[in-house]
Amino acid sequence: DVWDRLRTSGEYIGPDESPFERARTGWTSLFPHPLAGAEGTPPARFFDFWERSPFSDAYLGRMAAHLVRAYQLGQRDAVDYLGLSFSGLDYVGHDFGPESHEVQDALARLDGTLAELFAMLDSTVGRDRYAVGLSADHGVARIPEAVRAEGIDAGRVLNAEVLKAAEAAMTAVHGVGPHVALVEYTNVYLTKAARARAEKDPRFIQPMVDAVSKMSGIQRVFSSRGLETRRDSADPIERAAAMGHHPEESGDVIVVLKPNWIGTNTSTTTHGSWQPYDQHVPVVFLGAPFKAGRYTTPASPADVAPTLASLIKMSMPEADGRVLTESLQR
């Protein structure tokens, strides 16, 4: 019922204690972490702590092994697909930051969980009868306060502050609103009435764009109108925004934060920007169809699905990714 280090403390990089980590209520920034929380913590919080520990990923690995055996996955005359999302590491990163002992420990434990799963597949399915694609949906920013302590520009931009600045600017020019319905991280959503005016006159939102652009931590502010058509833009920021844009779900105005600035005050750190550290993730393949090696050609998590599909001669013509042919056995 306690999460402690898998290895000795000397095998971890950096100090365990950090003034910048925002541990969840019931925990501190120091190992060990009782899954029951501190004394007086409601028993129901056990599941919250368990989910935000490496033990949830270990459980998922055991459950996957059970599914393979129970449903004879990979052991029949058919192609089976098993998708797993090891999300415990994400929670740990949000709570303690990417340089913490907790993240290092979660990675070490996840490595063991994967080793056990692959060993089971080798013995149950056969080493030459399965292929694995492993990646991540995002990277992570360092803790802004830790970066700022090194003399580097960093900080937090809060949704409420963006909304206040945007609404004040729009009211000053266009009269009493409301004009802004919601600010959600990098997305600013206009009210229905304001959106109707913006569709008729793209310059309508300019007061908001100008005001938010002057805020600390803001790199760019621009309209999302027609953004879905700019996926091939030479501008890396615009292209990244376009790749993540959905015309029916995304905001009317996109706010891009400067490097090392994040848009939340409720967790130690987060992700979700166009910055390289948020896009830098591994793309790893395992199995007989693949050549061992490290490849320096550009790749993306979007390439995993078409590459795996190619193994069963299935094409994905509308996929964003490509088949990573350089990694395949000829």
Task: Locate the predicted segments by residue.
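A long, amphipathic alpha-helix that forms part
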Residues: 50-76, 89-130, 205-207, 211, ...
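Substrate-binding rim/cap in mid-to-C-terminal beta-strand-loop elements of soluble/periplasmic
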Residues: 149, 157-200, 270-312, 328-330
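Secreted, luminal/periplasmic, and some membrane-associated catalytic domains
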Residues: 1-23, 101, 112, 116-261
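Solvent-exposed, acidic/flexible segments
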Residues: 53-61, 103, 107-111, 197-205, ...
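Extracellular low-complexity, Gly/Ser/Thr-rich intrinsically disordered linkers
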Residues: 47-73, 77-83, 88-90, 256-258, ...
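Short, solvent-exposed turn/loop segments enriched in Gly/Ser/Thr/Pro and often Arg
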Residues: 85-87, 136-139, 320-324
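C-terminal beta-strand edge segments of enzyme domains
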Residues: 314-330
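His/Asp/Glu-rich, glycine-adjacent segments
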Residues: 1-78, 87-94, 214-220
